[in-house]
Curated annotation (Swiss-Prot):
Protein name as it appears in the record: Cilia- and flagella-associated protein 91
Gene name per UniProt: CFAP91
Ranges for region Disordered: 1-29
Locations listed in the record: Mitochondrion; Cytoplasm; Cytoplasm, Cytoskeleton, Cilium axoneme
Record's function text: Involved in sperm flagellum axonemal organization and function. May regulate cilium motility through its role in the assembly of the axonemal radial spokes.
Listed InterPro entries: CFAP91 (IPR026720), CFAP91_dom (IPR032840)
GO terms (BP aspect): axonemal central apparatus assembly; cell differentiation; cilium movement; spermatogenesis
Assembly and interaction partners: Interacts with MYCBP and AKAP1. Part of a complex containing MYCBP, AKAP1 and PRKAR2B. Interacts with CFAP61.
Reported modifications of this chain: Phosphorylated by PKA.
Record-stated family: Belongs to the CFAP91 family.
Cellular component GO terms held in the UniProt record: axoneme; mitochondrion; motile cilium
Disease entry from the Swiss-Prot or TrEMBL record: Spermatogenic failure 51: An autosomal recessive infertility disorder characterized by asthenoteratozoospermia. Spermatozoa exhibit multiple morphologic abnormalities, including absent, short, bent, coiled and irregular-caliber flagella. Abnormalities of the sperm head, base, and acrosome have also been observed.
């Protein structure tokens, strides 16, 4: 909404005092820039169109809402949707009295503007007089004419300050910085805004005016020209004003309508003026078409130039790319060619493969030989120790040395003076060319002609690559001829031609009638504009008044209907908005609920999958731990059994050795005693006693010993499989050795047993 403040005459409308509306919000209070119903009461409040007037009415209705909230005591503290805390009802109290018109004031202005335009087109029409209310300059409105303009940035300065001579003030040292900086009383702050000056430009101000009676100012005929649409005026606007003046002069020269004798002259003048206007309109249309055609040609030309430029860029890029590829391939081929030629030359130097002795004199005489330039691929690097020969100079390797060396240089080295060369004089004092200059010019022309002739290439017309077909012109159609065989056919042909003429004329008449029926309203309008009789004028005026009354009645009815529709639409809109808001929130809630449910299901599924995977991993880990525990137990058990068996064997062997030693000692003692007793008994025994001793030895010693040996062998054979299994688990690779040892032990035991049996038998035989 645009607020334009102009000075108008106060209209006779009832003023209703209103206080400035204060709009309160949750954040705090806010004072609006205008009152709610200023568009109805304030004569200085102007809107640009009926749309803005309707918008202001809607805003006032929304601000002063007539909907009232009535609390429900049963569900006053409820937050549920189906148990609302309050209900809405429409208040019957209207802040605007019924006698205040809510229509837009612009209709009256449009009606007044239409009357003004009618006065410019029809000189016979008299504009109704406007009665202005007394401004009461000497009465109650006198104070308005003593108000001076307020200039916010204007400040009157005394003349002694304006014309004072500026004096140079002595320099004063700034004071020492204190602990706290002084805060200036005023500060200038710059701001930047997104708005431009063009966004706030309005039409220039035009003051109010009063038209004198029986006068039509020429300036009012230019009311259609506005700023940016005809203003500032150009050549076209000046020509339009001149044509309007000529037309007004022509209308003034027309004969009066009351003079019936000049009716034919008036009609001819109007026809001529109409033809001139149509001719001028055709010229304007042709000019516009030519301008549009030129603009179209220029656009097409620019588009073609841009397209050609883009195509040339693509072609140049493609050509440069192909050229680079070609040059790279050529360089590669050249390098390959040189390398191949060098290899062929090296091979052909000694085709027969003879061994030649080195010619030292030839090598040292040839500076291209390997003596002076050895090949690095053979392991020779002539510049390997080149750094040993680098000269280290203080004046060249250090900055101080360079500065000292530069200070020793003369000035013309560091500060050169460039002198412009003198121009070569090619003319004499008389103004003629010198002979040398003329000869140089002639030689340059001859050289240029020779170069042009040398570089000129005869363009050979290339034969076409494919066969081209020469177009054969189409033969012309033969001229039709009509041959009449008899007079009857000729008469029939003439009758047909005449019938065709009648049909064409009838068609033209029908087209004219249809055009007249289509443009009947325009014809009636032209007839009303150029009515000839006073009675018809009165009739037209009465019809016009009736039409205006009907229009006002229709506007009033439409305004009332629009108000009712606006209120109903507002109620429907609020109800639909609440309903749609509730439905949208429910839809969002259901969607969120479904989405959350889907997330829950997905999370539950992932949790189950992870639990299954974790349980599987846990079972596998437990199984692996059990297997490792069993393996560890078995290994420990085997180790313990091995150690216990090893210790047991050691203890048993020790016990056996100790017992054997003790037994041997005891046996030796007993043997000595027995030997003594035996010698004593041997000296005293008889044959029967000897037989009895042998039998007792056999039955009491030999047979129990053999039985004891067989029992031990059975026990050893029973334990042997367990020992073999333990040894196979621990020492699988020593199985063969153990087997050999066992077999050897068995053989030894068998041999020992056999030897014992043999000894026993020998002893028996000896006894």
């Amino acid at each position: 909404m645009s607020h334009a403040v102009t000075i108008e005459e106060p209209q006779a409308q009832p003023q209703v005092s209103q206080t400035r509306y204060r709009e309160r919000s949750r954040a705090g209070s806010h004072i609006s820039s205008n009152r709610a119903y200023d568009f109805l009461y304030d004569p200085l409040f102007i809107v640009s169109s009926e749309k803005d007037h309707t918008q202001a009415n809607i805003q006032a209705t929304l601000i002063r809402s007539r909907l009232r909230k009535v609390p429900r005591f049963k569900t006053m503290f409820s937050n549920l949707i189906h148990y609302p805390r309050y209900s809405l009802y429409w208040s019957k109290s209207d802040p605007v009295p019924p006698f205040i018109s809510r229509e837009w004031k612009g209709h009256k202005e449009k009606h007044r503007e239409a009357l003004r335009q009618l006065t410019t087109t029809d000189a016979s029409f008299q504009m109704p007089k406007e009665v202005y209310e007394d401004p009461e300059v000497t009465g109650k409105n006198r104070y308005k004419y003593f108000e001076r303009p307020f200039l916010p940035f204007f400040q009157q300065m005394p003349f002694n300050v304006v014309y004072a001579v500026s004096k140079a003030e002595p320099y004063t040292f700034p004071p020492t910085s204190t602990k706290h900086l002084s805060i200036p009383s005023k500060s200038t702050v710059g701001t930047q805004t997104d708005y431009r000056d063009a966004d706030v430009q309005t039409d220039p101000y035009s003051a109010e005016y009063v038209v004198c009676q029986d006068s039509i100012p020429e300036l009012l005929t230019l009311a259609t020209l506005t700023w940016g649409r005809g203003l500032p005026a150009g050549q076209a606007e000046v020509e339009m004003i001149e044509r309007a003046r000529e037309k007004r002069a022509w209308e003034a020269s027309l004969p009066a309508l009351s003079d019936t004798s000049q009716f034919e002259k008036r009609r001819k003048m109007m026809n001529e003026m109409e033809r001139k206007e149509w001719a001028f309109r055709e010229q304007e249309i042709e000019k516009l078409q030519e301008i549009r055609l030129e603009v179209l040609k220029e656009l097409l030309r620019k588009r073609e130039e841009n397209q050609n430029e883009v195509n040339m860029k693509h072609l140049n890029a493609r050509w440069s790319k192909l050229q680079e590829g070609k040059e790279a391939k050529m360089a590669k081929i050249q390098r390959t060619h040189v390398s191949t030629i060098r290899k062929l030359v090296g091979k052909r130097k000694n085709i027969e493969g003879k061994l030649e002795r080195r010619n030292i004199i030839k090598d040292y005489s040839d500076y291209a030989s390997q003596v002076y330039g050895p090949l690095s691929r053979l392991g020779c690097f002539p510049d390997n120790n080149s750094e040993d020969f680098v000269v280290k100079n203080y004046y060249l390797n250090t900055y101080e040395g360079l500065v000292e060396l530069e200070s020793c240089l003369p000035d013309f080295v560091t500060q050169p003076q460039i002198r412009a060369p003198k121009p070569k004089v090619i003319t004499t004092k008389a103004g003629f060319l010198k002979r040398a200059a003329r000869l140089d010019y002639e030689l340059a022309e001859v050289h240029k002609a020779l170069l042009d002739k040398k570089n000129k290439v005869l363009e050979v017309k290339k034969p076409p690559r494919f066969l081209q077909r020469n177009p054969i012109p189409q033969p012309r159609l033969p001229t039709p001829t009509l041959e009449m065989t008899s007079n009857e056919e000729e008469e029939m042909e003439m009758a047909v031609i005449y019938l065709q003429k009648l049909l064409r004329g009838r068609v033209v008449q029908n087209m004219m009638f249809e055009g007249k029926e289509k443009r009947l309203e325009l014809i009636q309008e032209l007839r009303t504009c150029h009515a000839l009789q006073e009675d018809e004028k009165l009739v037209k005026k009465a019809e016009k008044q009736v039409t205006l009354a009907l229009q006002r009645q229709r506007n009033l009815h439409e305004h009332k209907v629009s108000l009712v529709e606006n209120h109903l639409a507002g109620l429907e809109g609020r109800a639909l908005a609440d309903m749609f808001d509730f439905l949208s929130k429910e839809l969002v809630r259901l969607q969120e609920e479904r989405r959350i449910h889907a997330f829950v299901m997905l999370a539950e599924r992932q949790r189950r999958v992870r639990e299954a995977e974790e349980s599987g991993r846990r079972q596998v880990e437990k199984q692996r731990l059990r297997e490792e525990d069993e393996i560890f137990k078995e290994v420990v058990k085997v180790h313990h059994s091995t150690i216990s068996s090893y210790l047991e064997d050691i203890i048993l062997n020790t016990e056996a050795n100790t017992a054997e030693e003790q037994a041997r000692a005891e046996i030796e003692k007993m043997a000595e005693k027995i030997n003594d007793i035996a010698y004593e008994m041997e000296s005293r025994r008889t044959y029967l006693q000897s037989e009895e001793i042998v039998a007792e030895l056999v039955y009491s010693f030999l047979i129990p010993e053999v039985q004891k040996y067989f029992v031990k062998e059975k026990v050893r054979n029973a334990q042997r499989k367990h020992i073999l299994a333990a040894h196979q688990i621990i020492h699988s690779y020593t199985e063969s050795m153990v087997q050999k040892k066992l077999t050897e032990g068995e053989q030894d035991e068998a041999s020992n047993a056999a030897m014992l049996l043999e000894k026993e038998t020998q002893n028996e035989n000896n006894s």
